[in-house]
Amino acid sequence: MSEFVDLYDRNRKFLNRVVDRNTYLFQPGEFMMYVLAILENEEGKFLVTQRALDKKWAAGGWEMPGGGAKSKESSLDAIKREVKEETGLDVINGHVVYSYFNEDQKRHDNYFVDIYRFVMDFTEADVKPQESE
């Protein structure tokens, strides 16, 4: 299934190109956007999710909710969608606490990641994990 993403340069400027992230080989200086969420409840507990066993990368591994931004999606819109899809939670009042780049020309794996932090009122019972994630 195709999933289209926007291409950015190293300064995070949109390059006016949209590509299929599953088939496109990223060239030097081309990046896609990923987002991750640190979700902390009011008791100071953090939510991590376990990846499905059939995932191509890190099957069964533990991770923070997140994923790739879709075409025309801002970083903030992407993290809201990803958290909702993966946990059933609606996030508000978050902010970026860290960003980094990965440029791996050997594997054509170029991306930048925005990591958000959200402190919110939720319990384990509120979390509704997505089976496919």
Indicate residue ranges for each PLM-predicted region:
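Conserved hydrophobic "DFG−1" position in protein kinase catalytic cores
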Residues: 7, 39, 48, 117-120
